[in-house]
Amino acid sequence: MKKVLKKLFGGFVDDYFISNASKKILSLGPSNKIFFFDIDNTIADTQGAKHLTLVKEFPLMIDLVKEKAQEGKVFFLTARNITTFPSTMQWLVKKGFGKGSFELIFLTTPAKKIKILHTAATHGLDVEYYDDLCYNHEYGEIKKYDQVINEVKSLKIRYKGIDDFRHLQQ
């Protein structure tokens, strides 16, 4: 029963955030710069974290996000559980991102991010995407979402994966 509810509720969450993000992306118009950032293990060191409001940031990645926000619109994409929305929003504001200065998009899986990236890429926007697209951090052997990475690389966007920004996670 729990799996059925999660599947039904998760589909609603995905549909809501994808629809809302698509409207905001399309309202930007062509030739605008748009920057997508994952949160977990991209701008925040969530490995082993028990409380998301206490998660340590990667300061140089936070600086990069703030720099990119001067150039265009910032969207945070996350595959966190929707129940963490308030604590995630609180964490972002605490790190210096004012409410209204960014969009926060929750999705049930990393693969769902492709729909949003595709919308931006096919509407003439200048898109840059930062995401480690990895999992299993807590078990010591990091694994990549290879299929998702390949799909992202097939889009007309600039993708920055873990190997591109690991040096900023000091």
Features from the language model and the residues they span:
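Structural beta-sheet core signal
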Residues: 76-78, 129
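Non-catalytic pre-domain segments flanking phosphatase-related domains
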Residues: 1-37
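Anion (oxyanion) recognition and catalysis
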Residues: 29, 66-70, 121, 153
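Short, acidic loop-to-helix structural element flanking the phosphoryl-transfer center
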Residues: 49-75, 85-89, 110, 115-118
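Short acidic, S/G/P-rich loop/turn micro-motifs used as interaction or catalytic elements
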Residues: 42-45, 49-50, 81-83, 134-137
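Short coil/turn segments at beta-strand junctions that form active-site/ligand-binding loops
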Residues: 31-33, 72-73, 123-127
